[in-house]
From Swiss-Prot:
InterPro entries: Ribosomal_uL16, Ribosomal_uL16_bact-type, Ribosomal_uL16_CS, Ribosomal_uL16_dom, Ribosomal_uL16_sf. It comes from Mycoplasmopsis agalactiae (strain NCTC 10123 / CIP 59.7 / PG2) (Mycoplasma agalactiae). The keyword rRNA-binding applies. This is Large ribosomal subunit protein uL16. Binds 23S rRNA and is also seen to make contacts with the A and possibly P site tRNAs. Keywords: Ribonucleoprotein, Ribosomal protein, RNA-binding, rRNA-binding, tRNA-binding.
Amino acid sequence: MLQPKRTKYRKPFLVRHDKRKAHKGNTVEFGEFGLQAVTSAWVDARQIEAARIAITRRMGREGNVIIRIFPHFSKTSKPIGVRMGSGKGSPEKWYTAVKVNTVMFEVSGVSEEIARDALRLGGHKLPVSWKIITKSEGDNQ
């Protein structure tokens, strides 16, 4: 699973994610087809990994998958049954904030039918609404 090698602070303050549109990372740059977010949400490292596995299994041995999002923020939690107080909990999961129009995954080297089907399967693993775009569609947004 994806997580940072090092962070400046292990436990961040409350991180708020912006629900506005993404102005960077909103076009297909490296592949031919992309999975673009239509809504904003927090995406967990496990969800990113589940989507990546679903996409690569559908594509078989052909083509490339490019992951365009990375979980930078840690989410802390305390164990169940622990009383209030005595400090902040330990980091449990890693998240990223996905804005509207962010391209999350890109696919290249496969036919359009396989690429659309693979991205559809991967999109169902994510907590955001999405659409599939091509490299030419991303230019005119």
